Amino acid sequence: MARLDKPKIELDLPDRPDPTRGGGAWPLMLDHVENWAWRNGLFTPEELDTIISIGESTELVKASTFGKQSDKNRNSFVTFLFPNEITNWIFARLAGAINEMNQQFFQFDLTGMEQGLQFTKYTAPGEHYDWHIDKGHMTASRKLSISVQLSDPKDYKGGEFELMFGRKPEKINRERGMTVFFPSYTLHRVRPVTQGTRYSLVAWISGPPFK
């Protein structure tokens, strides 16, 4: 995984001591944040089928971005799942994985899930979500994003999930049940589905502002 280039930020700090003249030096601070992390096997195939059935049993609506619809940028159908007696096990499973992966790979200060789980359906021909980040002026508290691959890769073509860290997109493994964790400021997209249907489950975890 490529390291994420950090923007240059000008800070009003005291002058650094010159180590050649004594007086010590600024300590080297290591960045413990990974670009992204993944795990599989969080849900069994039968459980993934159940999640799809739960999502399909609700009313899906055309996806929008900050209340605006644009097929050029985002073309899919979504619904939100909230904790109840039918879905509590999904939230519990994800919560355990999020705590574990955040502690191991990101160490973000997190407070909880911003909203429910977004169940998304991408259908051929052409439904997609172009390059975007999950953190914005209306979603500033988002810090960690999670995407679960619900579909069997044999059930669709296209629909690749990609993350951008350098000059070339990084394609994520299409294995069913693959769960991807990445900072919400990461540029990512879902390429157009050319055949079949792709289902995913997305969560955003919030916290205080980055420091």
Give the predicted meaning of each segment.
Residues 1-179, 185-211:
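Fe(II)/2-oxoglutarate oxygenase catalytic core
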